[in-house]
A protein has these predicted regions:
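Walker A (P-loop) ATP-phosphate-binding motif of ABC ATPase nucleotide-binding domains
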Residues: 5
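Hydrophobic anchor at the beta1->P-loop junction of P-loop NTPases
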Residues: 8
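P-loop (Walker A) phosphate-binding loop of NTP-binding proteins
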Residues: 11
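Conserved substrate/cofactor phosphate-moiety recognition/catalytic segment
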Residues: 14-71
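Short glycine-enriched, charge-decorated loop/helix-capping segments at active-site entrances
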Residues: 45-50, 117-124
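Glycine-rich phosphate-binding loop used to anchor ATP phosphates in small-molecule kinases
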Residues: 51-100
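Conserved phosphate-donor/acceptor-positioning beta-strand/loop module used by diverse small-molecule
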Residues: 95-115, 147
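Small-molecule kinase domains that catalyze NTP-dependent phosphoryl transfer to phosphate-bearing small molecules
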Residues: 120-161, 166-167
Length: 167
């Protein structure tokens, strides 16, 4: 079976990790989060462009290794810049993995309340980071599906399963 490379992308706090975990469980895939990679690679994050490049380079390296061993991979990150998304396209092409891109979206008031309620999460993103990213997020031009995570977990799960063809 051909491995999949599924990039779950979107603004901070929209619920990417929730959706990515669901996909990883259903696909028996390795879940790779930029938040976790950053924690592994950087002791005191400053979120500079150089640091972002380092984190995404390591993310793609880990994905390449997993795909090389025959595993599917779910990537969880903002992928704020088109260049990072293009690297996912290139990786899929180089490894022969089937690429999917899922944009997770959520209404702003819901995001802000979820960010305020976060505890014990690898993400450092706060409400100001969310608002800043919202202003500077490159539009997604790649073919993609969208999941609206503004509602209940059951509604989000149903959308994810519909994308995978599961009911």
């Amino acid at each position: 079976m051909t491995p999949r490379l599924l990039a779950v992308i979107g603004l901070p706090g929209v619920g990417k990790t929730t959706v990515a975990r669901e996909f990883a469980d259903r696909l028996d895939a390795r879940l790779l989060r930029t938040d976790t990679v950053r924690t592994d690679c950087v002791s005191d994050p400053d979120y500079t462009p150089a640091e972002r490049r380092r984190v995404y380079t390591e993310l793609f390296s880990r994905a390449r290794d997993a795909i090389g061993s025959g595993r599917s991979v779910v990537l969880d990150g903002t992928f704020r810049n088109r260049a990072d998304r293009e690297r996912a396209v290139e990786l899929a092409g180089e490894t022969g993995a089937t690429l999917g891109v899922v944009v997770v979206d959520c209404e702003a008031p819901v995001v802000e309340s979820r960010i305020a309620a976060r505890e014990n999460d690898a993400s450092d993103a706060d409400i100001e980071v969310y608002r800043d990213f919202r202003k500077r997020y490159d539009s997604v031009r790649l073919p993609h599906a969208t999941i609206d995570n503004s509602g209940t977990m059951a509604a989000t799960r149903a959308q994810a399963m519909a994308l995978l063809g599961d009911d």
